[in-house]
Amino acid sequence: MTNIIDPIAEIDESRVADQDVVIGKSRIIFRRFMRNRTAVAGLFIFLALFLFSIFGGFLTSWDKDTIDPLNIGMPPSPDHLLGTTQAGIDLMALIVDGTRTSILIGLIVGGISVLISAVYGCTMAFFGGKVDAVMLFILEALIMMPAILVVAVATSGGGGLKDLPSWLLLVVVLLFFSWMGTARLVRSLSMSLMQRDYVKAAKYMGVPSRRIVWRHLVPNIGSLLVLDFTRGITGAILAEVAFSFIGIGIKLPDVSLGVLIGQATGQVSSFPWMFWVPLTVMFLLTGSLAMMNDGLRDAFDPSSSSIGRAKTKTAKAGK
């Protein structure tokens, strides 16, 4: 299991010496990850989809706003590599735009939610007492809010938000709910770190609170935050697909994988490519992130046997 609250174990492992060869901690983590074939495969799949979402438009001469009246509801062909929709729109162009939207939502929600979790959780643990009690009460109250109801109201234009793009509204709502569970875990781990001698010494010497949090607490829960980032991306993408599928997420003219899957669900028998293509892209996207997450978890694990292989290989190279 990943040791995210014992910095001594991490430090001891990051200095593996054999015949004057010392391997840095970050290098060990990188080697472990790169030796995990499943994780590397996931990384390549995700990068391929990411590049596809940016440059995929060059693979077709059509865009998502152009209708081909001569090819309406047609299967894949040389002119339309992934076929066309019932409206005569090139499916490749829609997939590129939808993949880009889904990845963008995942990255924004995953990144910002991790930052909020780290700041909120560490703040509760550092100050403790009444500050911790009040912040924990607020956290518990937010957790009890019904997410689906909030999403439905926000994306329908409630609260005077009609002028904002539907994908941006969904990002705001997902951010509102995505950080709470991790914040509680960060609080728990940070409270354990607060009992460490080096943290007590820093407080005794009058080191500013902000510096203690960012210098001593956040780095020692880094593995948790990295893993939560990849899980957050996956969770946000799946949430987008689920909410858009049932009609309370992203709405036209914005396009996402969830929108494409939802619109094609009732036409699987007549136009199967309209359903299976975006569904396959979604599985590849979330599956690659899950593979990367498993690889990162193993790479951060101090008990992993790959440290021994790294040590042996480096020692042989030094002879």
Can you describe what each PLM-predicted range is?
Residues 143, 154-158, 238-281, 307-308:
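Glycine-rich helix-loop "coupling/hinge" segments at transmembrane-helix boundaries
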Residues 160-164, 177, 223, 227-231, ...:
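C-terminal transmembrane helix and the adjacent membrane-cytosol boundary/short C-terminal tail
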Residues 42-43, 91-126, 285:
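Transmembrane alpha-helix signature in integral membrane proteins
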Residues 1-44, 292-319:
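Transmembrane alpha-helical segments of polytopic membrane transport and secretion proteins
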Residues 100-116, 210-242, 289:
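Transmembrane alpha-helices
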Residues 81, 91, 112-119, 125-196:
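Generic hydrophobic transmembrane alpha-helix motif, especially the helices
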Residues 94-98, 138, 145, 186, ...:
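Short hydrophobic alpha-helical segments within the ABC transporter permease transmembrane module
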